[in-house]
């Protein structure tokens, strides 16, 4: 299969067709605004005639999996990072269906009679009755690579499959699909597979995905009809093959063509069709309920707004209002029309319909979750409805585990290594010993263990808690939390711990503090509400929804300092929700200020944060040196091919082959290129780590300095290379090939140059060039900020400057400066409090963006705020020789 762009262009061709399969000619002319839009379907055509497009089912062998897996192509994307991406809907096989839940849904009497026998009994029963070639479609999306493609499947509905069995036309590529379900293998629903295939091709990807999610959402159970329950007993009357255990067999099954097998499949299809149709609403009722609700939503009464419900809930709560049509379950009829317009005027045909849809959408955005359920007992199980579409984990790092049906073995986690010692007194020491932190999280093993124990205890017990983490920027706070959550999530995927959801909210990415409600609720439920409705929904969710109907949530409030407001409502609500008994909420707050709760949050919030507080100290120079060496492990002592003409470089692997190059560059002739070896002087790393550890201990700054030093070393080499090329331009350079390896070192001078650049920002350079009066102004401003912790008035700064000069009056240099600034030789007067060129000094700082001023008629009452980092300003002022005497 195609794994590179060159192979793809040889094996595959991209075509665009209409809904009927006719090719659409590419034209450079831009379509006019009034023209009718033509729906395009992207096709991938292989050289042997295989055609892939939305709606086609493919069978793939995913890397790392033992078995084949089936997927329905949902969307073909072009011009992305992988050039062509296939986003597909996942199928489930018979052994992935939750047998107990299936019988509970379709045959309640059989389930109640045998539920004491356990899940294994239902699995064995379903294994003996199921059709091994049947697939179940889910709304879970996965990205599939063309290199994993095995063959294109032939999907049949139940009538076509039954005819094929009767006629003896079965083959290994034929599969039956008549149902959809949740990714967990529960809540089976009728599905016309061919209707859905056409819907994928003719509608927007979001529309078809939402349609599939709607029909698989759990609905409130209807009262069972006893006359129909008796008919359902036929489902378990016939047994299939001699297999009694639901072992995971090969994906392709050889179907027997005997008359007994034909009768068995026919009876199974008919009986299961009756069972499913009795328990689920058919497709026509589903669409009719949506139309009926859309028409009813045009009313502007306040009562209707308060009693708003979704289409699924309306269909459950008020079944008598629907006009139920009697149709055959074999042919589901849907009133949804194709989105391809038949006439040019069809684009503007029904503005009223779109207006009604907008009203429904607007009402839903303002309707809290609490308004949809008057009684908390009516709330369905939200474990499968919520929290299955959003998770703030590194999906790329865990991609294979999510896509693989059965892995060869479990991954080792902290829990699997020390699960017996987690509740002992030495649990923290055991966690530190269990993992090799030096290879991925050096110098943070104690903090990792503390956070792990707090999160593990809350997730395992299903309780709520709050954790406050503080430390200066760049000391590994967020990274440590993410590593802990990744390990816990791996344990949850392997069923070692209860499943939970991880959500990140960054305060710097939110415009207003109240917007965090919208972000939080959208990541929990997948729906977007306004701030007020989201806050009310969150309050209802954590306080009223029973704990058995939801999963634990771990929310990371990163950059907590940015969420602090005057009212403190946002901070209070987040920590207050964690105090509810039904919440199952774990709040991990990360801030840069050590005493933020006591200084800015107040007693009512500080008491709810609790006593679990973990402080991250700055890295020492030994720890910084270890981290730098770890990050530069593959760069130090590495080799490159360097083009003498252009200066472009290609990294060389130990086997002398280029790394991260495409096929054309791999075939390039490097005989005329220079071979360069890069070496980083250990003394240079030592100086960088010691210098940064003495200032802040910020590892990000240390890595940035070393990276910049490598760039300086590269520039020095290129300058030397250009000089040699100019000098030797008239000489024969045929002998300077790859055989002569040159050496370029990153020396102390490169580190020093990078340190000076990183420590002197444009604002710092401006402060260093200020006059003494401007520096004295900033010095007085910073002193007042440290003393008052509030806004500083201009008059207070003048008094502080005067006080500083009076205190240091014995210095002859200060006396001379006082005479120059205030133009007085002996006695001070009130008229002499204004320094010479005062407006110029203040405007100079304002224009540079160093300070911000509030303009009032009375200048002395106007507020002055520092607009840059206080640490950067103090660093520049401390370097001034005159201010060192203060």
UniProtKB/Swiss-Prot annotation:
It is found in: Nucleus. Residues 276-309 are annotated as: Disordered. GO terms for cellular component: nuclear origin of replication recognition complex. Residues 284-293 have a biased composition (Basic and acidic residues). Mg(2+) binds at residues 558-559. The record marks 101 as: Histone H4K20me2 binding. ATP binds at residues 471-479, 559, 592, 700. It comes from the Eukaryota. PROSITE patterns: BAH. The keyword Chaperone does not apply. Residues 50-192 form the BAH domain. Transmembrane segments: none annotated. GO terms for molecular function: ATP binding; ATP hydrolysis activity; chromatin binding; DNA replication origin binding; metal ion binding. Keywords: ATP-binding, DNA replication, DNA-binding, Magnesium, Metal-binding, Nucleotide-binding, Nucleus. One of its GO terms (biological process) is DNA replication initiation. It holds the Pfam family AAA. Residues 300-309 have a biased composition (Acidic residues). Component of the origin recognition complex (ORC) that binds origins of replication. It has a role in both chromosomal replication and mating type transcriptional silencing. Binds to the ARS consensus sequence (ACS) of origins of replication in an ATP-dependent manner. ORC is composed of six subunits. Belongs to the ORC1 family. This is Origin recognition complex subunit 1. It comes from Kluyveromyces lactis (strain ATCC 8585 / CBS 2359 / DSM 70799 / NBRC 1267 / NRRL Y-1140 / WM37) (Yeast). The lineage of its organism: Eukaryota, Fungi, Dikarya, Ascomycota, Saccharomycotina. The gene is ORC1.
């Amino acid at each position: 299969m195609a794994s590179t762009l060159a192979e793809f262009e040889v094996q595959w061709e991209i075509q665009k067709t209409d809904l009927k399969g006719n090719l659409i000619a590419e034209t450079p002319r831009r379509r006019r605004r009034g023209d009718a839009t033509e729906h395009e379907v992207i096709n991938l055509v292989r050289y042997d005639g295989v055609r892939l497009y939305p709606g086609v089912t493919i069978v793939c062998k995913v890397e790392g999996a033992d078995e084949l897996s089936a997927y329905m192509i949902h969307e073909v994307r072009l011009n992305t990072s992988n050039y062509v991406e296939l986003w597909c809907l996942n199928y489930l096989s018979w052994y992935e269906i939750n047998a107990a839940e299936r019988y509970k849904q379709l045959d309640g009497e059989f389930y109640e009679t045998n539920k004491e026998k356990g899940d294994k009994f239902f699995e064995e029963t379903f294994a003996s009755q199921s059709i091994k070639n049947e697939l179940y479609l889910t709304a879970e999306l996965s990205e599939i690579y063309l290199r994993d493609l095995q063959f294109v499947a032939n999907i049949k509905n139940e009538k076509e499959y039954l005819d094929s069995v009767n006629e003896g036309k079965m083959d290994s590529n034929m599969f039956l699909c008549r149902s959809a379900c949740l990714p967990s293998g529960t809540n089976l629903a009728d599905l016309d597979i061919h209707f859905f295939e056409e819907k994928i091709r003719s509608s927007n990807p979001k529309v078809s995905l939402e349609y599939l999610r709607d029909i698989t959402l759990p609905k409130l159970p209807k009262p069972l009809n006893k006359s129909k329950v008796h008919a359902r007993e036929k489902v378990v009357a016939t047994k299939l093959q001699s297999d009694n255990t639901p072992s995971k067999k090969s994906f392709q099954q050889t179907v027997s063509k005997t008359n007994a097998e034909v009768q068995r499949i026919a009876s199974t299809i008919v009986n299961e069709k009756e069972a499913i149709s009795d328990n689920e609403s058919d497709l026509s009722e589903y669409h009719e309920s949506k139309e009926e609700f859309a028409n009813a939503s045009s009313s502007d009464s306040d009562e209707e707004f308060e009693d708003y419900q979704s289409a699924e809930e309306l269909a459950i709560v008020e079944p008598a209002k629907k006009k139920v049509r009697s149709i055959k379950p074999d042919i589901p009829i849907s009133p949804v029309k194709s989105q391809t317009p038949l006439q040019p005027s069809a684009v503007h045909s029904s503005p009223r319909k779109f207006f009604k849809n907008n009203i429904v959408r607007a009402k839903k955005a303002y309707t809290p979750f609490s308004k949809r359920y008057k009684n908390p007992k009516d709330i369905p199980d939200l474990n499968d409805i919520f929290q299955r579409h959003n998770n703030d984990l590194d999906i790329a790092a865990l991609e294979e585990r999510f896509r693989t049906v059965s892995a060869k073995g479990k991954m080792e986690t902290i829990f699997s290594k020390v699960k017996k010692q987690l509740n002992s007194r030495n649990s923290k020491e055991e966690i530190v010993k269990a993992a090799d932190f030096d290879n991925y999280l050096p110098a943070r093993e104690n903090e990792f263990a503390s956070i792990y124990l707090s999160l593990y205890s809350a997730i395992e017990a299903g309780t709520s808690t709050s954790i406050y983490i503080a430390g200066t920027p760049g000391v590994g706070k967020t990274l440590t939390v993410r590593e802990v959550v990744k390990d816990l999530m791996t344990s949850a995927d392997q069923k070692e711990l209860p499943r939970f959801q991880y959500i990140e909210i960054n305060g710097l990415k939110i415009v207003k503090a109240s917007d965090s409600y919208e972000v939080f609720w959208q990541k929990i439920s997948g729906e977007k509400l306004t701030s007020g409705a989201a806050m009310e929904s969150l309050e209802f969710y954590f306080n009223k929804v029973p704990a058995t109907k939801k999963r634990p949530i771990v929310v990371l409030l990163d950059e907590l300092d940015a969420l602090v407001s005057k009212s403190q409502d946002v901070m209070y609500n987040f920590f207050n929700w964690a105090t509810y008994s039904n919440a199952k909420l774990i709040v991990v707050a990360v801030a840069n200020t050590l005493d933020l709760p006591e200084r800015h949050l107040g007693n009512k919030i500080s008491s709810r944060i609790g006593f679990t507080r973990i402080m991250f100290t700055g890295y020492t120079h030994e720890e910084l040196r270890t981290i730098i060496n770890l990050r530069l492990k593959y760069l130090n002592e590495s080799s490159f091919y360097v083009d003498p003409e252009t200066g472009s470089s290609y990294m060389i692997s130990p086997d002398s082959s280029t790394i991260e190059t495409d096929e054309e560059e791999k075939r390039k002739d490097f005989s005329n290129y220079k071979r360069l070896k890069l070496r980083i002087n250990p003394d240079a790393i030592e100086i960088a780590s010691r210098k940064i550890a003495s200032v802040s201990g910020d590892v990000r700054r240390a890595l940035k300095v070393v990276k910049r030093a490598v760039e300086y070393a590269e520039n020095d080499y290129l300058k030397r290379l250009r000089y040699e090329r100019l000098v030797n331009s008239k000489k024969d350079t045929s002998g300077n090939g790859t055989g002569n390896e040159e050496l370029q070192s990153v020396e102390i001078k490169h580190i020093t140059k990078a340190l000076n650049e990183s420590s002197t920002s444009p604002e710092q350079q401006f402060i260093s060039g200020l006059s003494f009066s401007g520096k004295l102004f900033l010095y007085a401003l910073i002193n007042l900020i440290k003393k008052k912790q509030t806004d500083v008035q201009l008059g207070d700064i003048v008094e502080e400057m005067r006080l500083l000069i009076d205190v240091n009056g014995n210095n002859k240099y200060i006396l001379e400066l006082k005479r120059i600034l205030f133009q007085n030789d002996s006695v001070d007067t009130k008229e002499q409090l204004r320094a010479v060129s005062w407006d110029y000094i203040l405007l100079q700082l304002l224009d540079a963006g160093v300070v911000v001023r509030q303009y009032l008629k009375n200048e002395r009452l106007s507020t002055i705020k520092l607009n840059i980092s206080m640490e950067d300003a103090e660093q520049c002022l401390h370097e001034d020789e005159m201010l060192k005497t203060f």
